[in-house]
């Protein structure tokens, strides 16, 4: 049987209400990993309306905000365990990521960001010119000859 009033739960609920405000948002759990030529970040946001999601980028800092509205105060609650209010998370991205091509999607309570590696950060070959009309392309310890026609 559920207790109508549990002082510890009331204190916990109060703490979530106070900490989950726009001035001091609650943190959202996330996972991040590299997948081929991009980084993927997933945030758990169950029960969040997609219209309340806000993603901003300034230089190399991505800020993700979401809000779960407060419950009707006239409702007699028997349990309140889900956090309400504002959620926020900031990620500082490395210079090797292309912040202009970030893609976001929201499905089944999970917000996914796909952040591609910048072209300038991808491995590439550098041609070394020689005076005899040939170019040598450095490839690790090996060398490949390129002949100009």
UniProtKB/Swiss-Prot annotation:
Disulfide bonds: none
Family annotation (Gene3D superfamilies): 2.60.40.790
Signal peptide (UniProt feature, chain positions): none
Span of domain sHSP: 21-131
Free-text function comment from the UniProt entry: Not known. This protein is one of the major immune reactive proteins in mycobacteria.
Family statement: Belongs to the small heat shock protein (HSP20) family.
Protein name in UniProt: 18 kDa antigen 1
Organism: Mycobacterium intracellulare
